[in-house]
């Protein structure tokens, strides 16, 4: 009989526990047995996900980290790829990635970024993912798309 996969639990956190620092909070999550820390990416939801994820992996040894999810409209894919690669290096492979097309109108209002119709946002997210995948392959990237152009 095949052995079933171990069931894992993740937790979403966007600020430190009351009375604790961020470092203490993520260490407590690891001690409690959580497998993954998910950090949301909304302008009004506390900490920035990439910085919070980087801090979490340097404070823990087994806890995986992931954005829940990165809104592609707010960051260029080349910058996101670089930041995620850095977190992957710091964590020795404990990063998971989620990308999103954006849905929360207040994020767009508060940043002054126009909120395009859903189809445009989804197309941009798909292109964003293609660019990141190409960059992660480790070769020079020349890409011309509808939303992004990358050279070198």
Write out the residue ranges for each language-model feature:
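Structured beta->alpha junctions
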Residues: 41, 69-72, 76
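Structural beta-sheet core signal
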Residues: 11, 67, 97-99
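Active-site-proximal loop/turn and secondary-structure-junction residues that shape catalytic pockets
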Residues: 13-17, 43-44, 71, 101-105, ...
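Internal, glycine-rich beta/alpha segment that forms the wall or movable "lid"
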Residues: 2-7, 23, 76-152
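N-terminal beta1-alpha1-beta2 module of alpha/beta enzyme domains
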Residues: 1-64
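Alpha-helix-loop-beta-strand connector modules within alpha/beta enzyme cores
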Residues: 49-70, 124-131, 135
């Amino acid at each position: 009989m095949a052995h079933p996969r171990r069931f894992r639990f993740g937790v979403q956190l966007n600020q430190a526990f009351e009375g604790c620092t961020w470092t203490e909070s993520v260490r407590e999550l690891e001690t409690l047995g959580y497998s993954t820390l998910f950090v949301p990416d909304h302008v009004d939801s506390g900490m920035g996900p990439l910085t919070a994820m980087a801090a979490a992996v340097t404070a823990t040894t087994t806890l995986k980290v992931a954005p829940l999810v990165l809104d592609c409209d707010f960051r260029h894919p080349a910058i996101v790829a670089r930041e995620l690669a850095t977190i992957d290096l710091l964590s020795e492979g404990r990063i998971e990635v989620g990308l999103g097309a954006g849905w929360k109108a207040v994020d767009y209002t508060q940043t002054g970024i126009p909120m395009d119709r859903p189809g445009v946002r989804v197309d941009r997210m798909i292109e964003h993912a293609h660019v990141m995948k190409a960059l992660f392959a480790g070769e020079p990237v020349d890409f011309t798309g509808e939303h992004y152009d990358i050279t070198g």
